[in-house]
From Swiss-Prot:
Protein name: Arginine--tRNA ligase
GO molecular function: arginine-tRNA ligase activity; ATP binding
Reaction it catalyzes: tRNA(Arg) + L-arginine + ATP = L-arginyl-tRNA(Arg) + AMP + diphosphate
Native source species: Wolbachia sp. subsp. Brugia malayi (strain TRS)
Key words of the record: Aminoacyl-tRNA synthetase, ATP-binding, Cytoplasm, Ligase, Nucleotide-binding, Protein biosynthesis
Amino acid sequence: MNIFKRISSLILSKLDKLKQGVSSVTNFIVEPPSNRAHGDIYTNIAMVLAKHEKKKPVEIAEVLAKEFALFDEIARVEIAGPGFINMHLKIEVWHGILEQINELKTEFGTLNIGNNQAINVEFVSANPTGPLHIGHARGAVFGDVLTNLLKKVGYRVTKEYYINDAGAQIDTLVRSVYLRYKEALGEKISIEKGLYPGEYLKPIGEELAKKYGRELLEKQDNRVIREYTLSSILELIKEGMNLLGVSHDVFTSEYELQKSGKIEKSIKLLSDKGLVYEGYLEKPKSKESENWTSRKEMLFRSTEFGDDVDRALKKEDGSWTYFASDIAYHFDKISRGFNNMIVALGSDHGGYIKRLKAVISALSDNQAKIEVKLHNVVNFFENGKPVKMSKRSGNFLTVRDVVEEVGRDITRFIMLTRKNDMVLDFDFTKVKEQSKDNPIFYVQYAHVRAHSLMRNAPKELPKANPSLLKTNGELFLIKTLAKWPDVVETAARLCEPHRITFYLLEVAEAFHILWGYGKSDLNMRFILEDNPNLTAARMFLVQALVHVIASGLSMFNIEPLEEMK
């Protein structure tokens, strides 16, 4: 049970009885207060209603507080500040939730707000010009954990990777591999500026030389090299994702979309709707006047759907713009039945949000929607020095390098220790420490401690009676565990999987603090030889903790530890 949704529902029901039509007000808060002394749940409903009723929030709060006090779940109600209503729940409510956790086990927190709706989540989509470097890991983990969250709340998820295999960067890559092919045949080469000098291209050149000999030197057509190179590098990328525990259901090629005529089809669809025209764009503010000339262009009426400017569909040389390829790609997604889409992009793609939303609205007649989530950079440090990454320089840290250094689970967890749009620092020393400063260790240690208690507890105990759990520490841990369904729903709704990380740390801290009480007060220990009933109740609490931590770690595909290695 999501206790916060339950109280919210009771509030709406009460409002409907008090004033007809007021139940339509839904943008109010029902959540735990930051200060525990202010109760278990607070709401700002009085302040929201004050705008409609044209009364002081405190006056409304006084009326509502008396009504809320009649709820079966409520022990007492208080009014605070300008009109906040603080509610203290009856202790029986928390004991009941504890029983529910142990009944549902790791299914506690599983919801069905998605109603089996199909949703497409595109993430990683790294350019196929080299192995997956660690800079891509954040987006990969973000997308993968987000899809697990969406499945937990009832969505039918398709995980997709868009292969950017059309354009100048691929031509540059093919030329770079061609040089490595010549090198493998014994020729001396010189890698000119702008090409990819990475050592990872050497094996591809050697494989081409072994398979084709000198045959490809005499051909003007580079399709064989192109296809072999892209296939080889995509396998390298998949290998990196596999090491990180990330997989995709669908890989869509930009090159194949262009070959299939999807760009022309999607542009025609927009044109038939009157959304494509020939016109002139104003000079972009980011460009100097000498680098830009006004010209007649094929434009999409993006501003009709909330964008800042209309968008060019063709380049000066007559070829399609990258945005035109994006239109075709999302037209393809919609054609495959996806009306709900999420795409995770690097923070440098912030300018794409409005145009993507505009074209989705235009293509679907406002029936489809897309959520764009940006993930910021990760700063890596090695021996106190920044580790820089660049494919063209050939020096970059791969996913394999990091996973072999610190492990898959640590890498996945650390990538979500900050909100996705914030810069993240990854300290190779700290993430391997067995201390509170290492987030994944702190959570796993709570799980290990819990299992140690269960192993050491008497095998024969009476049936657990949760009503014996009354101390502040015990109740605080129960209340923290009870938040899990609300955390899951909020994290999924906002596409913010870092909330799971923060929550697991909160659970671990509450448990470690409670465990620590037993050091100074023997009566606070979980296992009491002279009190089997209280021991059984506390082990019941420990069991609930184990279920919630296991459920949370499953979002990361991390196996909870029972013993420290």
